[in-house]
Amino acid sequence: MLQVYLVRHGETLWNAARRIQGQSDSALTEKGEQQAYQVGQRVRDLGITHVIASDLGRTRRTAEIIADACGCSVVLDPRLRELNMGVLEQRKLDSLSAEEESWRKALVDGTENGRIPQGESMSEMAQRMRQALDACLSLPENSRPLIVSHGMALGVLVSTILGLPANAERRLRLRNCSISRVDHQQSPWLASGWVVETAGDVSHLEDTALDELQR
């Protein structure tokens, strides 16, 4: 049975400022770097063989810290990027006009073909995220990969594995540097294919998560 660990990147400057990141980028905060270090300490004895990350800076840096603890190198995969938020990227949430907020709401509420202008739909992201996960099936036998990606991207992946619509990710809290795990199994009794073992574990993190403070 293949086990794949899923980690959201550490806290960023734009997370703290409540600014829309999408496929734009901002650096990890000092707290974000510490969160990544705590993930590394949690997983270093789990036999991680591969660290695979979105090629955006915040995931790349998170992955580097974790990979150092595990004695692995980092492989970048652009399919693991966050949702392309189009013309709303880099904007603060409280600066959106009523029309712009309607675009965002249609997208995250699962309106059919909902997307932000110049952006990406949830279903398009779900497709590329599943492709990136399925690529782990081609790794050598006894591999144990760890993927570093983004909040919405990982939420969509976990939701669709469970047979839920992509926009169900809004009901799944994956905090910065949370750890999830999905397994690929073949079973005559249980569901075959990808199954969710855990989602959103933050027991390794020492401080209160930013989104808890901002609720």
From Swiss-Prot:
* Cross-referenced InterPro entries: His_Pase_superF_clade-1 (IPR013078), His_PPase_superfam (IPR029033), PG/BPGM_mutase_AS (IPR001345), PGM_Phosphatase (IPR050275), Phosphoglycerate_mutase_GpmB (IPR023086)
A molecular function (GO) term:
phosphatase activity
Is Iron given among the entry's keywords? no
The protein's matches in CDD domains, at most eight in alphabetical order, are given as: HP_PGM_like (cd07067)
Which GO BP terms sit in this record? Answer: glycolytic process
Q: Where is this site: Transition state stabilizer?
A: 150
Q: Which family is annotated?
A: Belongs to the phosphoglycerate mutase family. GpmB subfamily.
Write down the NCBIfam families for this protein, in alphabetical order.
PRK03482.1
The protein's matches in HAMAP family, at most eight in alphabetical order, are given as: PGAM_GpmB
What name is this protein filed under? Probable phosphoglycerate mutase GpmB
Q: Which organism's genome codes for this protein?
A: Erwinia tasmaniensis (strain DSM 17950 / CFBP 7177 / CIP 109463 / NCPPB 4357 / Et1/99)
